[in-house]
Amino acid sequence: MKSIPRRRFLKQAGQATALGCLGTRLTAASGRIALIANPAGKLIAAPSVQWALGELRQAFEAKGASCITAATPSEAGDFSLGVIVATESAALPSEGFRLAPEIIQAKPCVRASASDTRGFVYALTELADRVRHGSDPVASLALASPLVVRPANLVRSIARAFVSEVEDKSWYYDRAFWREYLTALVVNRFNRFSLTLGLGYDFPRGVTGDYLHFAYPYLVAVPRYNVRAAPLDDAERDRNLEMLRFISEETARRGMDFQLGLWTHAYEWTDSPHSDHHILGLTPQNHGAYCRDALTLLLKTCPSIQGITFRVHGESGIPEGSYDFWRTVFEGVQRAGRPVEIDMHAKGIDNKMMDVAAATGMPVKISPKYWAEHMGLGYHQAAIRELEMPQAGHEDDPIFSLSNGSRRFLRYGYGDLFQEGRRFDVLFRMWPGTQRMLLWGDPVMAAAYGRASHFCGASGVEICEPLFFKGREGTGRPQGRCGYADESLTPKSDWQKYAYTYRLWGRLLYDPQADADQWQRHLRTEFGPAAHPLEDALAHASRVLPLLTTAHQPSASNRGSWVELPANMPIAEGQPSPYSDTPTPKRFGTVSPLDPELFASIEEHAAELLQDRRGPKYSPVEVAQFFEDTTTAAEHALEDASRQATSRTDPAFRRMEEDVRIQIGLGRFYSAKLRAGVLFEIFRKTGNLEAHGQALAAYGKARAIWAAIAERARKVYVADLTYGEIPVRRGHWLDRLPAIDRDLAAVEASRFGAGPDPTDRVLRAIAQAAGHPARTSVKCTHNPPKTFQPGSAVRLGLSVHGAATEVHLHYRRVNQAERWQSLVMKGEGSAFQATIPAAYTQSPFALQYYFELRPPKAAPTLYPGFDEFFANQPYFVVEKAI
């Protein structure tokens, strides 16, 4: 057998001059497609591989091709194109695959190879995807050279939550929905699906919509316990279990792992007179044993459940430190009689809780939040907010003794989890505080996440899908999850709006270097000639909210901050703040970045400007300038797409256009408001009326932009988009205007004691706040060590190609509970040297570091810093030698 170039591949298939006729020609016997797979092979006979073969056959037949299945090429007889499913290839890693062109029996073929069933599923669904999105099936499979791919991340998971009986029952019971949705996930190389229950509320207080919240009695009747969720009847409970079994089996049928999230173990609701259900038959005495036995029954009844996710901190309804309770519950996993993963949400975790899980002998994961409860940039924050550092005085808290006290650093980050010798894997989870509803799609940022998700040996990432919390806290509405006021925009299934988002995440978490055709083919099918400019428009617009989340975030909690539709944080002094977990005094200028190591707050930057100096951190004005640039690029691309679109009234085009326009508006609003915030801080510190006037003008501009967003969105989205009960979690852009107007009036009325006539320093500060900053660029060369030996000094060198009078090394163990250290590097010409002390490296953690450069006549800057899209890791990481 030999490889075949693409041109010859097409020619031998008889398509070199008549590709357009393929659909009719392949209906003849001589135009048959042969799927050659020997069912005697153990891997090929696996149900998931057979399912994938069926998908490929359906793709061919949908294009008018005639398909035959054979065990060998000779058995296939006459065919025009063969797809050969090869036997196991040990050279390929788990979940990797190889596609290669070959000639067999003088016929063009594609050989698909893999080392496991999941690799074969990906190979075959990749071929099917090419056929579905191609103009003809043979040309779609013409490979210029062999394609070999392998996963960058071991776990690539999507989580979908049931939080509303009103909105979620329809999709939960819809078998057709599950078949299409799960197929879309595996085609895009997700390898785990997590059905999340018990997250409708963060606390068991004020509960109304409680369906499946404490999940067991909604699913199983446990012998010897007379426990039920009144008034749920037995038939509905049994139907719920039947559907859970179906969903888990359909997930496994496609070669994916099925994970069940059980986030609530409270059975009584506090101050909840209007709850829809009441759990009967449980007492403190039988609670733990019931949960254990219910979990065992659930796992035995649904053998395709391969893991359980638990929330083990106080919001589960179980006080932190209740080790005996969790030891009892985990026995339910052990009694299932097979390996079942225990995945514990990281908040409130301590070593003793880790020991309880490890003692089961089951595989254990701990899943910290990626960027608090939001979506930041595609790296891991260099530092957590000061509010998340450990705090004394909470040891006697009856519910949150750990997560509010000594283990506070695990509330919103990975904390101290990356220790050598850990008995658990780490799986990041991206929470839905930033992107809940608007369409997102930036290949550059998705690839950055693909590179960052195996940070320090992490297993990967679970993404809470769009609409994850829609209808939470009893706010479900019958008009549908997407929230469109114009019903013509509502897709058949809610996930279909986000098909492109799923494709980017799945493909680029699997392979951050994936060929762009993997997502562009989808856009070409959907949008024809407008595909390329739409890709650019959405990518540029999608860069706004992750950067905003990283650089300026008034609340780490998704309950408090909805970045797409934020409650207005006041600029003026003394106005009521809608956010509680934010620095005091609570106003726009004091808001912390989610990464305060690399980004400056408004107050911090204004102080620098007034001291006539610039710090090395990325400033709010730099962020504002990026927003201006990326939204301009998005708008131009959207205009190109509008000119090239086959139909501007097509629902898919309109959905993308409207969401892009809203994100453009958000970027421009925050660009103006960030500048207004810096100018107001200058006014607050100096009393300078020029600063006051410019702050007022910038804020007025921001207000006009917001009003335009809101007015356009009035025709697109319903007036009350519900992701929770209180105003910060629901509403519409129009609702936010009154608070903006009140704050704008307060800014106008503000007066501070004026100093003497403005100095040049103050005027320069005002000009820089309103100007167009350009970050200092210094070319450097650095070769990071591959590993280090704990207890030995780590010597680092940096070559600076240009003037730098001083270079500082900033370093820290990969432990967010610790603070960064720094030292001045010794310079000789362009070469700088520094040593991380041996005593500091003696720890169970890897090291991370970056450089601060201070040129003689320019602002300080950072190396490696960020690239032009803020889509890289801005520091170096060195792991311990094995």
Feature names for model-found ranges:
Residues E61, G134-S135, N191, F203-G206, ...:
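Catalytic-core regions of glycoside hydrolase
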Residues G23-A37:
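C-terminal segment of N-terminal export signals and the immediately downstream linker at the start
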Residues A52-E55, A59, L92-N286, K300-S304, ...:
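Feature activates predominantly on carbohydrate-active enzymes
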Residues K2-T17:
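N-terminal secretory signal peptides and thylakoid transit peptides that target proteins
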Residues I68-P93:
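Short, well-ordered secondary-structure micro-motifs within conserved domains or adaptor modules
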Residues P137, E465-H732, R736-L737:
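C-terminal non-catalytic alpha-helical accessory regions
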Residues A40-E61:
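Short, charged N-terminal beta->alpha structural module
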Residues I740-I882:
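Glycan-association/targeting regions that enable binding to alpha-glucans and other polysaccharides
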